[in-house]
Curated annotation (Swiss-Prot):
GO terms under cellular component: DNA-directed RNA polymerase complex
Name of the protein described by the UniProt record: DNA-directed RNA polymerase subunit beta'
Signal peptide from the UniProt entry: none
Function: DNA-dependent RNA polymerase catalyzes the transcription of DNA into RNA using the four ribonucleoside triphosphates as substrates.
Listed EC numbers: 2.7.7.6
GO molecular function: DNA binding; DNA-directed RNA polymerase activity; magnesium ion binding; zinc ion binding
């Protein structure tokens, strides 16, 4: 083991786990530990043969002889010291102290011990394997009986020796021992003649037994088993034993093959019973137990391991440095708990040796056996040890080996899956409005520490008079002013990763270019707040420095903040302006008319010759920001406007002209927002006029012409008559950002740009337009002229700039370009081209901040405007409540009905007051508060109602119990007396008190919700972590039919067909009504095609789906469709499983725990929403919250619905009768019974299909799978999950939910193994099952049969093919035990197992990605292989790039790195999970 090094770790292809036999332990061991001592109390040196012995575990000082203390050189490693006679005797090997982390020892146990995990975990593996049945009876030996046996509390009959009174495998307990032994001795006595010696001995023993059994001592302490065991064994072949020796005998004599055959025959019997009686639940349980037993027996057969390996003969002692003993100040020592547990074992083992030597009585030895067993149990798993764990002096349970593996603080999750990171730091964040999207402000002291090696390199290379690493280090530590220019130089071209915990989705870690700032806080770009969910009220963020060239390239290309504009969960821009910026833009785009606002509007109708003239007039207050003016159309700086040539002048406000300058020349001109009136049909079929807000732009010729005027018109007159545009709100700005993204996001690859740059020189600089025009976009179409112009402009500008630099640098007349110059040009062009959208966002940000400042928006109490009708509405409510009270007093309504009516009335009154106040917003458009919530900057109308109207109903903290939901009780979770005051008028003492309930409940809900949501994300990541995009096309012909997702209760659309098909591939060609092809099979449905499909009235579309993808352990590009974060087809290597988990988990916090109800019956409808329901679906609960739905079992029709009374209390039930046809054509009926009063979803004569709801409620997924097929279950889960999120206003793409559903239905329970290698009762992955079935059918053999099983998110990771991934999730001991008995091999296919081993994950840049795809991040020099490289001129061979660059300093910089790596300074943790302790 000591030879195991990092090189080997990199090459590991698979890992196998199996049981360690006695020989294995001895081979690992470097010596036996025989003494419980640790170190000498005087010399502090390890004791010989103790737990820290240097001869066994290695020296405590490098290359020092542990016996004579001689120091050796490194070159003497692995030699033997023979300096002294003692050295010659013990032959100590000279080793480095590092081996103390890998050299093991062992303790030879005098009596074998049963491994605790194998009889305690997973309902006792030993019990399942042995499956002991008591001879001549139907009784079996339970795992509890076996446990008593292991702890020497009872004995077992191993062989009956022909005695009828001793049944083989019978457990002899202390309570009935006397009777059993007496009967056995009686029977044995009859075998001998009366006067023989044997007869005498047995008679004597029998008499002694009878007299002792009735005595007080016998009744108190029981009989001495050993004495009678010996007598019985001596005179017959019967064998009775106890403890580990009995288990050893049983394991040695088990016939595994016979046992497997017996279990299979038992299962066959039960299956025959099932054919006659399909609903026998007791038999189902019995079969399930047999399946589990068969799995264990088969595991030992297939792995070929000896079951006796579950006993411990020699106990391994883990390496000394993994259980350290640390010296504290004051001469005290602190030690790992494991040492204390080992000490107890050694002390007891040594005491047993003494008893053996002195031939002590068997009872004393038995007690010692038991104590050793318990001591080893405590070492292995102290927390599970019964009755109580072993505690330390201060009564704390000691941490055993299991505890160091499991849970959040265990080895897997703390050290293997999350590590502390060098080159990192953390600080508070403050806003940096002056930063660009791709920049972060790093405090310069922090940068000096983070980039220390690079800075030292610059200092040594520069003219700083610092010429050694030590001097450089000192200058940095003292923050010598000389270093700052070199710090600037060192961070050039570097990127840093920024992370904010909790890391809920991939945008919680992004890359930025560092900018040095003074101060101690990190400066964050304000638009980056949304993806990080950060604010500036004291949040902290961590910075990490990627070191290698590949890491920097990956961070820059894939993680740079300016490239992550779209959110992965819905494909919409996640970087949207908000708050101050929105307020500024709203103010900037407001329009005012002189006729209405009078003097406030200066200069309306004026004409300016140029944009600059207009700006000058605005700055000199000759024209106001909101005044409409005219400019020549040439001055607005827009290309390709479609308008009549005679209209030369354009009308807008000064603010809009300024606003439009933020966008590129080829982007449309935005005029503002108009309200249009359109006819809309409502749910009842009535046509009503409804308002629709439309942003007018120059893209629409009709809209543009409204704002254009010909030469010679009276501008002032025309403008005065024109209607006012509305200002832009948050939603409008978000739509504009989306349009900017769609138009200007990069549509060519880096290699395309490189191919253009490769062809240019000074003579061909004019042909760049033609070269760019030849490029194709990601869909293989010629690129848009806007992109050609942008690329041409950037390349020409940068080419000229670099040429000039070369001329200055080389002092030549003509620039001589080298590969480095081409690379530099490519990097700059690529950055500028991919940064256009971010630039526009930065422009918008700057405008927003500037004009929100200029607007001078403030709020005061006078801004809170009230409505005169509020008081009368509240009075009307009081009157109505009085009326309800009268009705109740007269017995006309129940108290629950009165309560519900009260709640409903107050909710309606609050809604009316809100409508009244909304009307006021139109009358006072300049009111600061109204501006804030009309623009979407902060707050909304319901906040304003609390300020100016009434606070309304308050929640209290009444808990809704499961029983309430099942019995449909009205739960009074709302205080029925509302808070009638507003904040403006002030609350009364009672109202203030009433408000505290809701506020407190809100805070506790949020805290609980965050923890639960984090745990959900963790479970989902474990479910889907291995799923990546693996190939182009899996070739499936099996599609997934989608239509609008409807809420059948309210008949409203939850998710429209358009949203479900856009960005997916078709499975079959789609034609319109006239048979014209809209889109062919296997084509991507673009937004345009999706619109056409919907407009043609097509209601159902068959698409390619993850749910029908044939790619094992992943998906193919066609079945997945579009990568929402890039808005183009997904790339091979994308870790879509993790993205899916994050997209579902991240908004989990927003799914409220409490159930929104403002009245109405607090029944199932209210309660089934929210987070609880999501957990129910994803964990596939068998008893969901509330009453489960009643579903149809067959195809047929409803023939009768009637109400009946039953039982002594005359409980009313509804009985629904369905008629259906059996397979042989007979007509049968089936009755569904439910408590009266529940909502029935069918009528008489309705046709029903299996799985259709007959009575309202949540459907139990297992029941749905039983009556329907997997497609039915898939559709139901998808619909329910989408309903939960969409009702809360959260958009999540279907494909993410599909990935999780696919995993939930990915296992098949084998019911008939056919000719396959599977065995009955095993759970097999669906892809493995299909592959094996196909193979057997092709060979003409019998394929296996099975049924799909639905598994919840809690169980799926535990069923993973990788035991490493499963063990690091939950239930670690159970996973390791089951894997070890199978001798399971982990082939390292998923992400987690590779992280555990320190390998690169098999995704992204380490996958078989396609050329020029997202993950093809090659060295930019490779694009210019034919160009002159000055770095290679003195080198004969083309070396690795690291060897080429900085030849003279490479060794030096490597030395700096090595020194730093060993120091591991300023370490930090990237937190990948939430802070909940799950």
């Amino acid at each position: 083991m000591s030879s195991f090094n990092k090189k080997i770790a990199k090459d590991i292809k698979k890992i196998k786990i199996s049981l360690a036999a006695q020989d294995d332990v001895k081979n690992w061991s470097c010596g036996e530990v025989t003494k419980p001592e640790t170190i000498n109390y005087k010399s502090y040196k390890p004791e010989r043969d103790g737990l820290f012995d240097e001869l066994i575990f290695g020296p405590t000082t490098d290359f020092k002889c542990p016996i004579c203390g001689t120091k050796y050189k490194k070159s003497d490693e692995n030699t033997i010291c023979e300096k002294t006679p003692m050295c010659q005797k013990y032959q100590p090997v000279i080793l480095p102290k590092m081996v103390r982390r890998s050299r093991m020892g062992h303790i030879h146990l005098e009596n074998p011990v049963v491994h605790f995990w194998f009889f305690k975990i997973d309902h006792s593996i030993i019990s399942k394997l042995l499956g002991l049945r008591i001879a001549n009876s139907n009784k079996t030996v339970s795992k509890g009986d076996l446990e008593k046996l292991i702890y020497y509390k009872s004995h077992i009959v191993l062989e009956d020796g022909g005695l009828k009174k001793l049944q083989k495998n019978a457990i002899i307990d202390i309570s009935d021992a006397a009777i059993i032994y007496a009967d056995a001795l009686e029977e044995l006595k009859e075998r001998f003649e009366k006067d023989t010696e044997e007869y005498e001995i047995i008679s004597e023993a029998l008499a002694e037994l009878e007299s002792y059994a009735v005595s007080q001592t016998g009744q108190d302490y029981g009989i001495d088993f050993y004495e009678y065991n010996e007598i019985i064994h001596e005179f017959s072949k019967a064998k009775i034993s106890t403890g580990s020796k009995a288990i050893e005998y049983l394991l040695e004599n088990i016939d595994l093959k016979a046992e497997a055959e017996f279990i299979e025959s038992e299962i066959e019997k039960i299956n025959q019973h099932f054919d006659n009686n399909p609903t026998a639940s007791i038999k189902a349980q019995e079969r399930s137990k047999l399946y589990k037993r068969l799995a264990v027996v088969n595991a030992f057969i297939h792995s070929g391991q000896d079951p006796k390996s579950m006993l411990i003969y020699d106990l391994p002692v883990i390496p000394a440095d993994l259980r350290p003993l640390v010296q504290l100040d004051g001469g005290r020592h602190s030690t790992s708990d494991v040492n204390e547990l080992y000490r107890r074992i050694i002390i007891r083992n040594n005491r047993l040796k003494k008893w053996e030597e002195t031939d002590a009585p068997m009872l004393i030895k038995q007690n010692e056996f038991r104590m050793i067993q318990e001591a080893v149990d405590a070492l292995i798993d102290n927390s599970r040890k019964k009755p109580a764990p072993v505690t330390s002096k201060d009564n704390r349970p000691l941490k055993s080996i299991s505890d160091t593996l499991t849970r959040k603080k265990g080895r897997f999750r703390q050290n293997l899956l999350g590590k502390r990171v060098d080159y990192s730091g953390r600080s508070v964040i403050v806003v940096g409005p002056e930063l660009k999207m791709h920049q972060v402000g790093v405090p310069r002291e922090m940068a000096a520490k983070l980039f220390e090696p690079w800075i030292i390199k610059e200092l040594i290379n520069g003219d700083s008079h610092i010429n050694s690493i030590k001097a450089g280090k000192k200058a940095i530590e003292n923050l010598d002013p000389i270093i700052w220019p070199y710090v600037e130089k060192a961070i050039e071209g570097k990127v840093v990763l920024l992370n904010r915990a909790p890391t809920l989705h991939r945008l919680s870690i992004q890359a930025y270019e560092p900018v040095l700032i003074r101060g101690k806080a990190i400066k964050l770009h304000p638009l980056s707040c949304t993806p990080f969910n950060a604010d500036f009220d004291g949040d902290q963020m961590a910075i990490h420095v990627p070191i290698s060239e590949e890491a920097v390239r990956e961070a820059r290309e894939l993680m740079l903040a300016s490239k992550n504009i779209l959110g992965p969960k819905d494909g919409e821009p996640i970087i949207n302006p908000a708050q101050d910026i929105i307020l500024g833009l709203y103010y900037l785009t407001m329009e005012k008319a002189a006729a209405i606002d009078g003097d406030k509007v200066v200069g309306e109708g004026k004409f300016f010759a140029t944009y600059d003239e207009m700006l000058l007039a605005y700055e000199n207050k000759l024209v106001s920001l909101h005044a409409r003016i005219a400019l020549p159309i040439s001055e607005i700086n827009k290309k390709r406007l479609n308008y009549s040539p005679e209209n030369k002048y354009i009308i807008s406000t000064v603010g809009k002209f300024i606003f439009n300058r933020a966008f590129p020349e080829s982007f449309e001109f935005i005029f503002g927002k108009h309200v249009e009136y359109v006819n809309k049909t409502d749910a009842n079929g009535e046509v009503k006029l409804s308002e629709k807000e439309v942003v007018y732009t120059s893209n629409n010729k009709n809209q543009l012409e409204q704002f254009l005027l010909p030469y010679g018109q009276n501008f002032a007159e025309v403008i005065a008559k024109m209607p006012l545009n509305l200002p832009l709100s948050k939603k409008d700005v978000a739509k504009i950002v989306r349009r900017v993204y769609d138009k200007y996001v990069a549509i060519v690859t880096k290699s395309d740009v490189a191919s253009v740059i490769n062809q240019i020189n000074a003579n061909e600089i004019n042909q760049i337009f033609d070269l760019c025009a030849e490029l194709k976009d990601f869909n293989g179409k010629p690129i848009d002229v806007n992109h050609v112009e942008i690329l041409e402009k950037i390349i020409v500008e940068e080419y000229k700039a670099i040429s000039q630099e070369i001329i200055v640098r080389e002092r030549t007349e003509e620039p001589i370009w080298t590969v480095n110059d081409y690379t530099k040009l490519l990097e700059i062009v690529w950055f500028k081209y991919t940064n256009i959208v971010a630039n526009v966002l930065d422009n918008i940000k700057e405008l927003g901040y500037k004009f929100s400042t200029i607007s001078g928006t403030t709020i005061s109490i006078s801004d809170v405007i009230t409505h005169q009708d509020t008081k009368s509405r509240i009075a009307e409510g009081d009157k109505y409540i009085e009326l309800l009270k009268d009705y109740f007093d007269q017995g006309l309504m129940t108290d629950d009905e009165r309560y519900n009516a009260t709640i409903a009335k107050w909710a309606a009154i609050k809604d009316d007051i809100e409508k009244d106040l909304k009307k006021l917003t139109k009358l006072y458009p300049d009111n600061s508060l109204f501006m804030m919530f009309n623009s979407g900057a902060r707050g909304n109308s319901s906040n304003f109602v609390q300020l100016a109207g009434m606070r309304g109903l308050m929640n209290n903290n009444t808990k809704v119990l499961k029983a309430d939901a099942e019995n449909e009780r009205v739960v009074r979770s709302t205080v029925e007396i509302p808070v009638k005051s507003s904040f403006l008028n002030g609350l009364t003492a009672y109202e203030f008190y009433s408000s505290t309930h809701g506020a407190r409940k809100g805070l506790t809900d949020t805290a609980l919700n965050t923890a639960k949501s984090g745990y959900l994300t963790r479970r989902l990541v474990d479910v889907a972590q291995g799923i990546t995009v693996r190939e182009d096309d899996c070739g499936t012909d099996y599609g997934f039919q989608v239509k609008d997702i409807l809420d059948t209760k309210t008949n409203t659309v939850i998710e429209a067909l358009y949203d479900r098909i856009e960005g997916r591939f078709t499975n079959k060609a789609i034609y319109d009504k006239n048979g014209k092809l809209i889109v062919d099979a296997d084509e991507l449905i673009t937004p345009e095609i999706a619109t056409e499909i919907v407009e043609n009235g097509i209601k159902k579309v068959e698409i390619r789906s993850v749910l029908s993808c044939y790619t094992p352990n992943g998906v193919c590009k066609k079945c997945y469709g579009k990568d929402l974060a890039l808005n183009r087809v997904v790339n091979i290597g994308e870790a879509v499983g993790v993205i899916a988990a994050q997209s579902i988990g991240e908004p989990g916090t927003q799914l409220t725990m409490r159930t929104f109800h403002t009245g109405g019956v607090a029944g199932v409808e209210d309660i089934t929403g929210g987070f609880g329901r999501l957990i129910e679906l994803i964990d596939a609960y068998d008893s969901p919250w509330g009453r489960p739905a009643v579903i149809a079992n067959y195809y047929g029709r409803i023939t009768d619905i009637k109400r009946v009374k039953e039982g002594s209390e005359s409980v009313e039930y509804d009985v629904i009768t369905q008629e259906y046809k059996t397979r042989d054509g007979k007509v049968n009926t089936v009755e569904y019974k439910t408590r009266a009063g529940r909502k029935i979803r069918v009528k008489i004569n309705d046709k029903v299909t299996p799985g259709q709801k007959i009575v309202e409620g949540p459907i139990v997924l297992n029941n749905l799978l039983r009556v329907g097929d997997t497609r039915l279950v898939q559709n139901y889960i998808l619909k329910e999950v989408q309903k939960l999120y969409r009702l809360q206003g959260i958009t999540i793409s279907d494909k993410y939910i599909e990935i999780i559903i696919r995993q939930m239905l990915s296992k098949i329970l084998i019911t008939d193994s056919g000719d396959s290698d599977f065995f009955n009762g095993s759970l097999v992955d669906i892809h493995v099952y299909q592959k094996e079935s196909a193979r057997l059918i092709s060979e003409g053999k019998k394929p296996p049969f099975g049924e799909v099983k639905i598994k919840g998110a809690k169980q799926i990771p535990l069923l993973s093919d990788s035991f490493l991934a499963a063990a690091s999730y939950q239930e670690t001991p159970k996973i390791l035990v089951n894997a070890s008995i199978k001798a399971q091999v982990d082939r390292l296919k998923g992400l987690k197992e590779n992280i555990i081993l320190g390998h690169k994950i098999p995704a992204g840049t380490n996958s078989n990605f396609e050329e020029n795809g997202k993950y093809d991040l090659r060295n930019p020099k490779s694009y210019f292989a034919d160009k002159y490289d000055p770095d290679i001129k003195t080198v004969k061979f083309v070396a690795d790039e690291n060897e080429i660059l900085n030849m003279e300093h490479r060794v030096e910089i490597q030395h700096i790195f090595d020194e730093f790596q060993s120091e591991a300074f300023n370490a930090n943790v990237i937190e990948f999970t939430d802070d909940s302790d799950n």
